[in-house]
């Protein structure tokens, strides 16, 4: 008995470890793992089903088939444990040792490991400095390789074909050694002297000039150093012993009917053993060379197929023509070991069923079918029944439960009390896809779900299913209740706004209840208190919408917690007074004294959470929901065809638009406008018409005429059902109503271009056949997009999670004072995001001063909450430096101060929060939702008319930023720079709006001018790009020869002639090399120079430029001398959005990216080469000029002699993030990427906090490239982890040595995931073979710092409660350490202590 107890004790012992190392196995090591050699290919005897001796399932090698029973049956039972049977040689043990014991095969001839041979870059090839083709020729017995040239003229590693080999034999006899096959490769690898080679390479690299050579050498050097450092020997890449997998991991299962189901590995092993045995026999018989050679080649191929089938040549197929699954296939891909079994396990104690609505539930409850609960909580019920004495044994309890006796239900109710369950809906796109609820037992078979959590789950009740899981242990129940309970997840982790927000019916009910109607029953009455209003309403004496006065008692709780009570009389409506009854004390009456639209309700819940706290908010949300359902029922809102009121003006608007289109058509027919211009104008026309119709329609729908108490006719907001649904935000939008009652508008073709003829009908009138046909494009594109984008979005989320999974908050403060400069985000003149919203929940990095003084009003280190935001807005501060994840200096992980507020909880983030995964989920989750929502507007093209002026929205003072301008003769300014901006500041000096000014814009105001709201302050032509002179003088044409470089056109409408520059490809041969230009000269014909430089004022004209001045004309400063026409635009749609986000995160270089100035200086153009222009920048600091070749077709924004700053745009196009990082630094890159990604999401109305994007960006910026190695061990051009380099540099600086210099590198998320420190994480992501090969060769250690690695090895993740567990475990182990010291050490320490005290 004692033995048994000890045995059970030993079972539970888990090995503690801190890292996992992967390396190459030496032959000795493989033999040490092995329990015997497999000599025969047999598996099991088909009659007895017993394993064959020495075969692949041999019981002597691998252990017994049945527990504690040898094969022949001589020894049975536990008492013989450990005995080895004399007869069959089997050790008596547990059968599960067959899952652990390995065997080996002694190979008759060495075999190269295919991973190290074929996985690029080939490691064997790199070490031997031979090409892969050459090595393969040696391995597969096509050529000889010289191993030892001796005294001959041959070279080591030289390949010889048969003829050359025999010639060499005749010439030199056996002075040299040349062989073929894996033995030759093994010999060569064995002969490599790593230390000598490393020394040689280190000397050779600095002396080499060619880039490619250096790259190749440093690759070899890296590999050699990896081998040296890891203790792997190169010859171990060639196998002499092959390990055999334990038999229970490659089972052979007899099916009924005498057939067997087997793992493919058995076939592959059989092949290897057969060929190996045959080779042994041939060698014993000393068979002819050619036969042996063939057999060796076949053995090599068999081992290749076992390790990685299909990597070389054709895959070996089984009986059913299907390629066999090799060892490599077992671990890679979605069905492989990593993703199928280690990262995605199935769990016990779970069930799933369809969901239905539970409108009567409280927020923390869910309805669980009794049948389901009985099955899920079985063990608990058994225990309870036994404890109560209702059943004597578990077996009896089981019977009771099966019979469903009445006592069982009572016990079930007791077991379930306060035992939370987890509900999950697939796809789980963010952490709110799994939440905990308290179960309520219900009849029926469907799970009931609380309506308010549907938004978090993205669930609806059209047949969705959900899974239920039971947290078993006390700790799990505690975490479920404290962290995952639906009542604790009121705010969304993506943006910190409530996610428990009423939608649809509830919103409609609350909106209906808080609307006011003129002349409703009971209007003008005055009530003493809310109770009286309630009584009168119930008695039917006052209508819900009647305007009344009522006396209320309100308690208002201020931000600092002080409570003020006051009584006042308010003008309100009956419905609002009723609604105020459910509002918690502490909120003012004004929160309900307005029509409750969706935004208002969301704001109300948010305010409630911030002011009165979590518990009250939960109760309030429930009350809101019950009220909303009740009143939407009372309202009786429904849609009928008559609700779609078509505006009377529609016919007129469409008629006038049609006439204008006809006019344009006739202009086109007579050749006055080009095809492109016609297209643009027509589409602009129809867009405007569509907007007019929808304006008229909304005006018509939103108002209705009623008679007031005095009998006068007045207008009030309409009670049209459809309008109410859209206006309240319950369902539908203006765009959809437009299609129902306005006009459908323009449609897009599948390629994204817009069809010129719009659909003028709406759904109420019905579409004609042609119109229907046109609209099928959009509808189908929508559906196809959805299917594709769901997959794409899921993949984006996977990559994001993988790159950020190891980012966890590990300390409170890293102590940096770097940060990002935050300003309000202004776009197209609107403040899209005020400063307050951007800094909310961030920590201030540097003191904020009161504008114009030295007073610190917000000290550094402040976590900005709502109160501080109000304060910052009040003091009209317009820029703040805040801490950001990008600048955090924590080594592993991130610090709480740089991250700021935990958005889902509203306080500073806790240590252990997995902020990386939260960031990835927050960015990935809306991706899927956006893509699932492309087609709601049915492909109706929404195209913006091009902007051609700046009209200010608010009055204020003009500020010009970063603008170079010249003053025209009429006193207006003309912009001559590209990145200029015009801003309007209010009286506090805070910028309210900001506009980009294109080159050539005419500005009618000056810096510091006061302007009124609505004033137009700048104008330009959106369809052309002008060239503006910066000085006055006379025009002379250079190289402008008619019909050679230019052609003259006469405008038929105005009779003026224009000069158009011909495209190079349209010019005759004589004109190909000429560069047409306009030169400025003074009155005497002398060249004029650009102001402040010695560059002649000469403007080169690109192709298709239109020149509007004549030769010899006098012109003034700021006049336009030529225009370059611009192209048309495509529609903006999230379809362009999701790939855009993916491109930004993958840091892809865009096609035809914008060209940025590499240095600051003066622009000049050098000699042209074929098809390219030579751009020369002479730096301002006097260093060497920088030259760059730019293709001719690129349109340049700069002219000769212009000053540019480093990083300024020279040629327009999409920006390349790598260039921004290189030229402008990390902050500029962060600003660019955050804004670009936010633009895509903002277009769809999705809010994501900036810090999530910055968190991902931090992971993309982990690596640096060494530019100078200094005294460090790094090699120039190496990519290293930033933290590693910083630590090394600190060490060097402390020793007064030269530190290494580096540049930051931006990696795309896929690359960043694959280059993480952890090989387990990288291998389970993508390219498993390559990652593992590399890790094994370098002998990598995985310190299990991320979440993924720990999940794979089956431990708690080092985040949240797991982080505490791991740090406690490490602390305990460190505390135990000093006890393990030897006696001599104790003695030495004692004597030392005594001596020191004696002195």
Swiss-Prot record:
GO molecular function: DNA binding; DNA-directed RNA polymerase activity; magnesium ion binding; zinc ion binding
Keyword Hydrolase among UniProt keywords: no
PANTHER family: DNA-DIRECTED RNA POLYMERASE, DNA-DIRECTED RNA POLYMERASE SUBUNIT BETA
EC code(s) of this entry: 2.7.7.6
Catalytic activity: RNA(n) + a ribonucleoside 5'-triphosphate = RNA(n+1) + diphosphate
Assembly notes: The RNAP catalytic core consists of 2 alpha, 1 beta, 1 beta' and 1 omega subunit. When a sigma factor is associated with the core the holoenzyme is formed, which can initiate transcription.
Annotated binding of Zn(2+) 2, by residue: 814, 888, 895, 898
Positions with a binding annotation for Mg(2+): 460, 462, 464
Keyword list, A-Z: DNA-directed RNA polymerase, Magnesium, Metal-binding, Nucleotidyltransferase, Transcription, Transferase, Zinc
InterPro entries: DNA-dir_RpoC_beta_prime, DNA-dir_RpoC_beta_prime_bact, RNA_pol_asu, RNA_pol_N, RNA_pol_Rpb1_1, RNA_pol_Rpb1_3, RNA_pol_Rpb1_3_sf, RNA_pol_Rpb1_4
Purpose of the protein: DNA-dependent RNA polymerase catalyzes the transcription of DNA into RNA using the four ribonucleoside triphosphates as substrates.
SUPFAM superfamilies recorded: beta and beta-prime subunits of DNA dependent RNA-polymerase
Cofactor binding: number and manner: Binds 1 Mg(2+) ion per subunit. Binds 2 Zn(2+) ions per subunit.
Family according to the record: Belongs to the RNA polymerase beta' chain family.
Cofactor dependency: Mg(2+); Zn(2+)
One biological process term in Gene Ontology: DNA-templated transcription
Listed Pfam families: RNA_pol_Rpb1_1 (PF04997), RNA_pol_Rpb1_2 (PF00623), RNA_pol_Rpb1_3 (PF04983), RNA_pol_Rpb1_4 (PF05000), RNA_pol_Rpb1_5 (PF04998)
Protein name per UniProt: DNA-directed RNA polymerase subunit beta'
Positions contributing to Zn(2+) 1 binding: 70, 72, 85, 88
GO cellular component: DNA-directed RNA polymerase complex
């Amino acid at each position: 008995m004692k033995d048994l107890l000890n045995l059970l004790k030993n079972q539970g012992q888990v090995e503690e470890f801190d890292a996992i190392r992967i390396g190459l196995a030496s032959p000795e090591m493989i033999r040490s793992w092995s329990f015997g050699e497999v000599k025969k290919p047999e598996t099991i005897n088909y009659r007895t089903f017993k394993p064959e001796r020495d075969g692949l399932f041999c019981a002597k090698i691998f252990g017994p088939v049945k527990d504690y029973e040898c094969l022949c049956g001589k020894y049975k039972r536990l008492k013989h444990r450990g005995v080895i049977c004399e007869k069959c040689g089997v050790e008596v043990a547990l059968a599960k040792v067959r899952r652990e014991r390995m065997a080996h095969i002694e190979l008759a001839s060495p075999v190269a490991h295919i991973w190290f041979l074929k996985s690029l870059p080939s490691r064997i090839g790199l070490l031997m400095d031979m090409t892969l083709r050459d090595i393969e020729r040696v391995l597969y017995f096509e050529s000889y390789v010289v191993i030892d040239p001796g005294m001959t003229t041959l070279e080591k590693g030289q390949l010889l074909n048969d003829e050359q080999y025999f010639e060499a034999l005749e010439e030199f006899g056996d002075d040299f050694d040349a062989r073929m096959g894996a033995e030759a490769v093994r010999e060569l690898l064995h002969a490599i002297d790593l230390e000598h080679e490393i020394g040689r390479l280190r000397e050779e690299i600095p002396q080499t000039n060619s880039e490619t050579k250096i790259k190749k050498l440093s690759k070899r050097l890296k590999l050699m150093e990896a081998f040296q450092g890891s203790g792997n020997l190169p010859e171990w890449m060639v196998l002499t012993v092959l390990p055999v997998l334990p038999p229970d991991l490659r089972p052979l299962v007899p099916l009924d009917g005498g057939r067997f189901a087997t793992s493919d590995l058995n076939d592959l092993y059989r092949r290897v053993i057969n060929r190996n045995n045959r080779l042994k026999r041939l060698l014993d018989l000393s068979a002819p060379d050619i036969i042996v050679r063939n057999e060796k080649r076949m053995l090599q191929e068999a081992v290749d197929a076992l390790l990685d089938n299909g990597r070389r040549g054709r895959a070996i197929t089984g009986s059913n023509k299907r390629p066999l699954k090799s060892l490599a296939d077992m671990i890679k891909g979605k069905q492989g070991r990593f993703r199928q079994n280690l990262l995605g396990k199935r769990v016990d104690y779970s069930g799933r069923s369809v969901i239905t609505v539970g409108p009567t539930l409280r927020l923390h409850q869910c309805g669980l079918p009794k049948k389901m609960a009985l099955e899920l909580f079985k063990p608990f019920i058994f225990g309870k029944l036994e404890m109560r004495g209702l059943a004597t044994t578990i077996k009896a309890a089981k019977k009771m439960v099966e019979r469903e006796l009445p006592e069982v239900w009572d016990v079930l109710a007791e077991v379930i009390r306060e035992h939370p369950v987890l509900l999950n809906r697939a796809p789980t796109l963010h952490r709110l896809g799994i939440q905990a609820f308290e179960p309520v037992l219900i009849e029926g078979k469907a799970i009931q779900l609380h309506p308010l959590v549907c938004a978090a789950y993205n669930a609806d009740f059209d047949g969705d299913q959900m899974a239920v899981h039971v947290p078993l242990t006390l700790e799990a129940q505690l975490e479920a209740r404290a962290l995952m309970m639906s009542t604790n997840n009121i705010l969304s982790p993506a943006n910190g706004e409530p996610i428990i927000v009423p939608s649809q019916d509830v919103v409609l009910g609350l909106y209906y209840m808080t609307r006011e109607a003129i002349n409703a029953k009971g209007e003008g009455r005055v009530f003493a208190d809310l109770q009286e209003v309630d009584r009168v309403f119930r008695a039917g004496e006052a209508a819900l919408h009647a305007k009344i006065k009522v006396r209320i008692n309100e308690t208002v709780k201020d931000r600092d917690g002080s409570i003020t009570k006051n009584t006042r009389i308010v003008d309100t409506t009956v419905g609002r007074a009723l609604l105020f009854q459910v509002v918690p004390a502490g909120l003012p009456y004004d929160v309900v004294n307005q029509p409750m639209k969706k935004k208002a309700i969301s704001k109300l819940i948010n305010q409630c959470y911030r002011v009165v706290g979590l518990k009250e908010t939960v109760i309030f949300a429930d009350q809101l929901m019950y009220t909303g359902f009740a009143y939407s029922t009372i309202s009786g809102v429904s849609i009928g065809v008559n609700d779609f009121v078509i505006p009377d003006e529609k016919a007129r608007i469409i008629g006038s638009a049609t006439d204008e289109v006809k006019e344009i058509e006739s202009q086109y027919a007579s050749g006055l406008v080009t095809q492109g211009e016609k297209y643009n104008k027509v589409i602009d026309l129809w867009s405007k018409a569509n907007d007019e119709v929808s304006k008229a329609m909304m005006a018509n729908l939103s108002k209705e005429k009623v008679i007031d108490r005095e009998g006068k006719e007045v207008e009030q907001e309409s009670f049209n059902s459809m309008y109410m649904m859209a206006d309240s935000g319950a369902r539908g939008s203006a765009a959809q109503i437009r299609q129902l009652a306005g006009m459908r508008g323009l449609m897009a073709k599948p390629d994204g271009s817009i069809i010129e003829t719009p659909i003028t009908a709406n759904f109420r009138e019905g579409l004609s056949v042609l119109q229907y046909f046109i609209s099928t494009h959009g509808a189908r594109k929508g559906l196809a997009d959805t299917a594709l984008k769901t997959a794409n979005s899921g993949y984006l989320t996977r990559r994001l999670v993988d790159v950020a999974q190891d980012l966890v908050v590990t300390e409170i403060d890293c102590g940096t004072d770097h940060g990002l400069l935050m300003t309000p985000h202004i776009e197209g003149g609107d403040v899209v995001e005020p400063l307050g919203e951007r800094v909310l929940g961030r920590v201030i990095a540097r003191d904020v001063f009161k504008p114009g003084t030295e007073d610190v009003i917000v000290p550094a280190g402040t976590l900005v909450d709502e109160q501080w935001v109000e304060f910052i807005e009040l003091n009209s501060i317009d820029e703040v430096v805040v801490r950001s994840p990008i600048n955090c200096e924590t080594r592993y992980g991130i610090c709480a101060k740089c991250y700021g507020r935990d958005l889902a909880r509203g306080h500073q983030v806790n240590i252990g929060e997995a902020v990386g995964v939260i960031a990835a989920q927050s960015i990935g989750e809306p991706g899927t939702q956006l893509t699932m929502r492309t087609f709601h507007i049915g492909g109706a093209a929404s195209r913006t008319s091009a902007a051609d002026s700046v009209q200010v929205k608010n009055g204020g003072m003009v500020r010009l930023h970063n603008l170079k301008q010249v003053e025209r003769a009429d006193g207006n300014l003309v912009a001559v720079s590209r990145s200029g901006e015009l801003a309007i500041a209010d009286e506090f000096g805070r910028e309210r709006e900001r506009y980009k000014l294109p080159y050539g814009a005419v500005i009618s105001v000056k810096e510091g001018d006061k302007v009124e709201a609505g004033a137009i302050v700048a104008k330009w032509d959106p369809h052309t790009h002008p060239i503006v002179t910066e000085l006055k003088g006379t025009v002379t044409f250079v190289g402008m020869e008619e019909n050679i470089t230019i052609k003259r056109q006469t405008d038929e409408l105005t009779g003026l002639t224009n000069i158009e520059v011909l495209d190079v490809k349209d010019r005759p041969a004589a004109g190909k090399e000429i560069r047409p230009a306009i030169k400025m000269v003074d009155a005497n014909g002398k060249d004029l120079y650009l102001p402040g430089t010695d560059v002649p004022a000469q403007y080169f004209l690109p192709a298709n430029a239109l020149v509007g001045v004549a030769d010899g004309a006098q012109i003034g400063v700021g006049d336009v001398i030529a225009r370059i026409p611009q192209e048309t635009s495509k529609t903006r749609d999230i379809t362009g959005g999701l790939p855009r986000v993916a491109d930004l995160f993958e840091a892809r270089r865009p096609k035809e990216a914008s060209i940025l100035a590499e240095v600051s200086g003066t622009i000049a153009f050098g000699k042209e080469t074929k098809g390219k222009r030579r751009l020369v920048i002479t730096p301002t600091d006097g260093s060497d000029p920088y030259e760059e070749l730019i293709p001719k077709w690129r349109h340049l924004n700069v002219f000769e002699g212009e000053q540019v700053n480093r990083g300024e745009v020279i040629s327009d196009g999409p920006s390349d993030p790598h260039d921004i990082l290189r030229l402008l630094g990390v902050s500029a890159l962060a600003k660019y990427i955050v804004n670009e990604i936010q633009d895509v999401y903002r277009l769809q109305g999705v809010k994501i906090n900036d810090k999530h994007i910055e968190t991902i960006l931090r992971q993309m910026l982990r690596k640096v490239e060494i530019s100078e190695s200094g005294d460090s061990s790094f090699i120039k051009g190496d990519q290293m982890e930033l933290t590693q380099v910083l630590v090394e540099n600190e060490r060097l600086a402390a020793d007064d040595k030269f530190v290494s210099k580096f540049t930051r590198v931006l990696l795309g998320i896929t690359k960043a995931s694959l280059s993480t420190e952890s090989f387990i994480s990288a291998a389970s992501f993508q390219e498993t073979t390559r990652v593992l090969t590399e890790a094994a060769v370098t002998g990598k250690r995985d310190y299990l710092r991320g979440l993924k690695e720990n999940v794979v090895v089956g431990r708690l993740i080092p985040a949240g409660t797991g982080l505490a567990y791991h740090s406690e475990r490490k602390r305990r182990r460190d505390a135990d350490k000093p006890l393990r010291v030897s006696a001599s050490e104790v003695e030495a320490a004692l004597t030392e202590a005594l001596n020191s005290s004696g002195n």
